[in-house]
């Protein structure tokens, strides 16, 4: 039983690992990494940038409305954390700044992020609550299961919202198409009647 539980935990750990990325930031440019995060979810991370004399990199985290959740200038190596208040797309940005008189070179940036269950210290929780190792693993599994359920519920909700939006868009397109056809038919009828009156006035037709 214990082996089965630990195997399940290992599978979940492979599906939801901490995200690590490494890239080179071109001088006087900005690179942002975006991710959709659920409401009331803790996000923790750590970054490190290569040191280049005379060049600096600023760090900022913000949501789609421009609210700043974390910010630091002239970064080298540090940790950060923030709590998402609402479901939104959050972006982590690194901004390179190089003086005009200096020829800049690309700097290496390493970033590691964790969110939700990944941010919890289960060893500390187990020690504080005097839990056995198996009970700690069960607690981790329970939290992972809850996280999976919330993710699927959110995905289902977004799918329904997108379907409703598509249905509304299709209805509007159909209405606009019918309206356009009616306008074209009306214009064609008006042109025929106008030309008929014109030709009659010129006595070209009876």
From Swiss-Prot:
What is the name of the gene encoding this protein? bai
What residue ranges are annotated as transmembrane?
Answer: 173-193
> Which Pfam families does this one have?
EMP24_GP25L
Coiled-coil stretches: none
GO CC annotations, alphabetized: cytoplasm; membrane
The protein depicted here goes by the name Transmembrane emp24 domain-containing protein bai
Q: Where is the signal peptide?
A: 1-20
Q: InterPro entries given for it?
A: Emp24-like, GOLD_dom
Q: Where is the GOLD domain?
A: 30-140
Homology family: Belongs to the EMP24/GP25L family.
Q: What does this protein do?
A: Eca and bai are essential, though not redundant, for dorsoventral patterning of the embryo. Specifically required during early embryogenesis for the activity of maternal tkv, while the zygotic tkv is not affected.
Source organism of the structure: Drosophila willistoni
Major location (coarse)? membrane
Q: Where are the Cytoplasmic topological domains?
A: 194-206
List where in the cell it is found.
Membrane
Q: Which residues lie on this side of the membrane: Lumenal?
A: 21-172
Membrane topology qualifier: Single-pass type I membrane protein
An example of a GO molecular function for this protein is: cargo receptor activity
Q: Which PROSITE patterns match?
A: GOLD
Record keyword Secreted present: no
